[in-house]
Amino acid sequence: MAKAYDHLFKLLLIGDSGVGKTCLIIRFAEDNFNNTYISTIGIDFKIRTVEIEGKRIKLQVWDTAGQERFKTITTAYYRGAMGIILVYDITDEKSFENIQNWMKSIKENASAGVERLLLGNKCDMEAKRKVLKEQADKLAREHGIRFFETSAKSSMNVDEAFNSLARDILLKSGGRRSGNHSKPSSTDLKPSDKKNTNKCSLG
């Protein structure tokens, strides 16, 4: 029996508590949004399979499950990760400033050359914005990584961000190269048109 996928990529989301990591994972994996915050014990992950460059990619997306509050994210969490998404909240300047600390954590714990992506979440809360898009764009350029602003609430750019990272990993690992991979990947999965009224203030 043929495998249901061609590649398995382990992705991590890291960032300060409350920036919306869990909400982003649930939006990506289940196309759902819930503003009720339930802190999980230990490590949790969700799975979604996408098609990129004609390959079926199984994405195993890991959540820190609140560990960052206790500074207990260990090397074991980073082990085997092929891509890491650094998340901050555009309405929380401190969460953006701490991205540099998370970059340091990656350098100390993750495999050399792991693909990274910077993600500014809660862009549906423009009126409360504290971090300018230009600031994050500059930081991403300094580190040579991609940058997206997303909203787990509205689903804006969520698929695009995850698929872009998956495509970069695929190309790096010797997958089929497209004519232009500078754009975020397109997949067979369409963004949600659902409107939600809740805010993802935690996660």
From Swiss-Prot:
One annotated GO biological process: endocytic recycling
Requisite cofactors: Mg(2+)
Annotated localization: Cell membrane; Cytoplasmic vesicle membrane; Cell junction, Tight junction; Golgi apparatus, trans-Golgi network membrane
Glycyl lysine isopeptide (Lys-Gly) (interchain with G-Cter in ubiquitin) crosslink site(s): K46, K58
Motif Switch 2 location, chain numbering: 63-80
SUPFAM superfamilies, per database record: P-loop containing nucleoside triphosphate hydrolases
Cleaved propeptide residues: 201-203
Membrane topology (UniProt): Lipid-anchor
Similarity field: Belongs to the small GTPase superfamily. Rab family.
PANTHER family: LD44762P (PTHR47980)
Assembly, per entry: Interacts (GTP-bound form) with MICALL2; competes with RAB8A and is involved in tight junctions assembly. Interacts (GTP-bound form) with MICALL1. Interacts (GTP-bound form) with MICAL1, MICAL3, MICALCL, EHBP1 and EHBP1L1; ternary complexes of RAB8A, RAB13 and either MICAL1 or EHBP1L1 are possible. Interacts with PRKACA; downstream effector of RAB13 involved in tight junction assembly. Interacts with GRB2; may recruit RAB13 to the leading edge of migrating endothelial cells where it can activate RHOA. Interacts (isoprenylated form) with PDE6D; dissociates RAB13 from membranes.
Record protein name field: Ras-related protein Rab-13
Record organism: Mesocricetus auratus (Golden hamster)
This protein's encoding gene: RAB13
